[in-house]
């Protein structure tokens, strides 16, 4: 049995609470969430790292160094605070141990480049992804060449746009040239122009929305609503990586996505204007 170490900004959040059971369901006793470190108590619920460990059956580590030493593989969480990833990754990515870094990987391209440069310097296998990459509707995509995409999904740009942006860029398979942002209190839309002249839009609604796309191709238009168990598929791929499988997402793809994300953050400051990626 390989022992997983959780490293989080605060542990009482949906990913840390859900992953242990998902991992057990996927691979049984091949992997176990054995150790955990949380930098602070949850600012939402007040639960401390010690209380979380007592609830979920993990051993509390007082430092990241202690956790990295004891663990076989590492999982850096902080899914709602991607600005913490660079700090939380400093010791794990020097360890050489397989490391998964939860979504969203980084706030912008320079941060993402520094994180991956550290991993490459020390030979640490690692990757990051949106679970939506593994939605059956996208993985099994077959169509004539794509000419344009309109994508919709829930919640605000900062935390949830990765779940639309990553599968969109995976399907189009082309770098983004520039972006334009518009929005109001409960919604936003990002226009994306790709370097080959194709276009896409990405819209988020704070009130909630299914993950869906309308995809135009040279043959026909398709509406795709994600209904598959994409989180289960993501966990299966994560476990395979921890058990010795290949890195699941090339660093170059993630860096391209983070470049777009950083450009949109700049575009939010000047709505209605194109910003180069």
Predicted regions and their residues:
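C-terminal helix-rich "cap/oligomerization" subdomain common to oxidoreductases
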Residues: 51-55, 66, 70-80, 241-277
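N-terminal Rossmann-like dinucleotide-binding module
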Residues: 1-53
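A contiguous active-site-proximal alpha/beta segment in oxidoreductase catalytic domains
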Residues: 100, 105-161
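Glycine-centered short loops/turns at secondary-structure junctions
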Residues: 96, 123, 271-272
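Conserved acidic residues
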Residues: 34, 72, 147
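Interdomain hinge/lid region at the active-site interface
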Residues: 208-246
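Beta-loop-alpha module in the N-terminal Rossmann-like domain of NAD(P)-dependent dehydrogenases
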Residues: 55-116
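Rossmann-like dinucleotide-binding domain that binds NAD(P)(H)
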Residues: 147-210, 252-259
């Amino acid at each position: 049995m390989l022992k997983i170490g959780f490293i989080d900004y605060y542990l009482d959040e949906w990913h840390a609470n859900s992953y242990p059971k998902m991992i057990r369901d996927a691979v049984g006793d091949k992997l176990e969430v054995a150790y955990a470190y949380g930098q602070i108590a949850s600012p939402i619920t007040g639960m401390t790292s010690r209380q979380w460990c007592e609830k979920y059956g993990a051993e509390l580590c007082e430092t990241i160094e202690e956790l990295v030493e004891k663990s076989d593989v590492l999982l850096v969480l902080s899914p709602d605070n991607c600005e913490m990833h660079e700090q939380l990754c400093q010791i794990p990515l020097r360890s050489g141990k397989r490391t998964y870094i939860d979504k969203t990987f980084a706030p912008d391209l320079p941060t993402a480049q520094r994180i991956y440069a550290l991993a490459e310097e020390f030979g640490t296998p690692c990757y990051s992804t949106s679970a939506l990459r593994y939605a059956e509707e996208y993985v099994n995509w077959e169509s004539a060449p794509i000419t344009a995409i309109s994508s919709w999904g829930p919640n605000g740009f900062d935390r949830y746009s990765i779940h639309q942006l990553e599968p969109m860029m995976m399907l189009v398979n082309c770098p983004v040239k520039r972006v334009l942002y518009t929005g109001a209190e409960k919604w936003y839309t990002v226009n994306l122009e790709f370097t080959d002249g194709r276009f896409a839009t990405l819209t988020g609604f704070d009130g909630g929305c299914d993950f869906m796309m309308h995809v135009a191709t040279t043959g026909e238009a398709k509406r795709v609503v994600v209904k598959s168990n994409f989180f289960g598929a993501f966990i299966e791929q994560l476990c395979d990586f921890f058990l010795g499988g290949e890195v699941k997402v090339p660093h170059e793809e993630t860096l391209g996505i983070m470049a777009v994300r950083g450009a949109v953050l700049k575009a939010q400051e000047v709505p209605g204007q194109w910003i180069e990626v």
